[in-house]
């Protein structure tokens, strides 16, 4: 079979960050009765479901460590590798850091798909690493029933500039650097619903680096930051609220959306991860139309950065966004928690 004829998405049961284990199931897996090992230098661990682990070296610099891998979300091998690598590197930027090195994680059905196709996947990952200015320095591979690719990435950040998902404050405005709808558009393509003018839109967004995160970290008024991936905007926003003990008001019309997403949702192009996300986080949300839920819970692969910004810092944030070619507008606001109200209200 030629590489051109290969459709990688036919060889996996999941796609991109949409194949994440649901938050509810993950909670069960991660529960432990063992005594917790306390390391005072571990600034960010697993407690707040942040994007990466952060370790203070004690010299003003902290190391960021993360890993991310998944099954194909696109058919093209090179694009799959590039997207998976971009998505993994994003976790470093989301913590306010800069990547310094990556190693590859590859699972490949060697008796089903030719090694030359795997090479193209790795080449896509290498290309993304070069875009980030880092080496793909090694890795590990196994014979697996489905294709899997990703990276383990190491980064550094000035300790005082670490950005967490749990440090937002009431009054902060919310901003999102990429449009939503990646899961919807990729599902529409699988269902042969995607119009010609929307071809490759999702791939372009997924291949866009979140390099702006390192610059946003220089702004004191950026109180919290995370990237929006498999748990959808509402899932990751609820983690921001839970971490800081806040509530949020989200303005649906202001949320950036990929072209055509609402039309494709109406045609049933909704990935399975959407319902899993709502099953995990829906009880924290206010009422909303089904179509809104299908977009706000849509699992994103290599999605944008979600920022909580003090009003006084908005001009600085807009200047950094413009430098990176990003158009930003506020999509909501964080508020002091009030009893009897949903954690996230959608207006």
Swiss-Prot record:
Claim: Kinase is one of the keywords in the record: yes
Residue(s) at site: Important for catalytic activity: 20
Record-annotated active site: 17
Residues at which ATP binds: 20, 48-50, 68, 91, 139-141
Cofactor, free-text remark: Binds 1 Mg(2+) ion per monomer.
SUPFAM superfamilies reported for this sequence: PurM C-terminal domain-like, PurM N-terminal domain-like
Keywords, in A-Z order: ATP-binding, Kinase, Magnesium, Metal-binding, Nucleotide-binding, Selenium, Transferase
Quaternary structure annotation from Swiss-Prot or TrEMBL: Homodimer.
Biological process, per Gene Ontology: selenocysteine biosynthetic process
Catalytic reaction list: hydrogenselenide + ATP + H2O = selenophosphate + AMP + phosphate + 2 H(+)
A Gene Ontology term for the protein's cellular component: cytoplasm
Entry keyword Magnesium: yes
CDD domains: SelD (cd02195)
Protein name: Selenide, water dikinase
GO molecular function annotation: ATP binding; magnesium ion binding; selenide, water dikinase activity
């Amino acid at each position: 079979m030629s590489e051109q004829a290969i459709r990688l998405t036919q060889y996996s049961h999941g796609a991109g960050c949409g194949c994440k284990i649901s938050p509810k199931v993950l909670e069960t897996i991660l529960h432990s009765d063992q005594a917790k090992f306390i390391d005072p230098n571990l600034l960010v661990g697993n407690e707040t479901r942040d994007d990466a682990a952060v370790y203070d070296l004690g010299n003003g610099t902290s190391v960021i460590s993360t890993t991310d891998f998944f099954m194909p979300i696109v058919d093209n091998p090179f694009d799959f590798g590039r997207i998976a690598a971009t998505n993994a590197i994003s976790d470093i930027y989301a913590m306010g850091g800069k990547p310094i090195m990556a190693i590859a994680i590859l699972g490949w059905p060697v008796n089903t798909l030719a090694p030359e196709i795997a090479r193209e996947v790795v080449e896509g990952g290498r290309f993304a690493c070069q875009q980030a200015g880092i080496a793909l320095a090694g890795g590990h591979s196994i014979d697996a029933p489905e294709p899997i690719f990703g990276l383990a990435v190491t980064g550094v950040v000035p300790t005082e500039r670490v950005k967490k998902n749990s440090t937002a404050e009431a009054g902060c405005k919310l901003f999102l650097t990429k449009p939503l709808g990646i899961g919807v558009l990729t599902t529409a393509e699988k269902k042969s619903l995607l119009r010609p003018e929307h071809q490759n839109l999702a791939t372009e967004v997924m291949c866009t680096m979140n390099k702006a995160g390192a610059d946003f970290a220089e702004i004191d008024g950026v109180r919290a930051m995370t990237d929006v991936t498999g748990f959808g905007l509402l899932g990751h926003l609820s983690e921001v609220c839970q971490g800081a003990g806040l509530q949020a008001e989200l303005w649906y019309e202001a949320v950036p959306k990929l072209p055509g997403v609402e039309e494709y949702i109406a045609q049933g192009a909704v990935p399975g991860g959407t319902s899993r996300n709502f099953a995990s986080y829906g009880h924290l949300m206010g009422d909303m139309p089904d179509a809104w839920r299908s977009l706000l819970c849509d699992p994103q692969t290599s999605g944008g950065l979600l920022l909580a910004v003090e009003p006084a810092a908005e001009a600085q944030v807009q200047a950094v966004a413009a430098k990176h070619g990003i158009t930003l507008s506020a999509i909501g606001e964080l508020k002091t928690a009030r009893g009897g109200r949903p954690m996230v209200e959608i207006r």
